[in-house]
């Protein structure tokens, strides 16, 4: 995989993590249980983050990609 693509994946990972972090902080500041939709978005982001991390790991030089 080209270095540019790896850089793009890393940038995407950073954006996903920032979005998830903001949702979690917002939920923590609320005085009640987060809405189901918020919990689902946090969970969906976690799954997407894991997928992007796996892709980055697979595509790093020396990983047999």
Language model features with spans:
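A short, structured beta-strand/loop element
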Residues: 19-22
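Short, charge-rich amphipathic interface segments used for partner binding and complex assembly
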Residues: 24-65
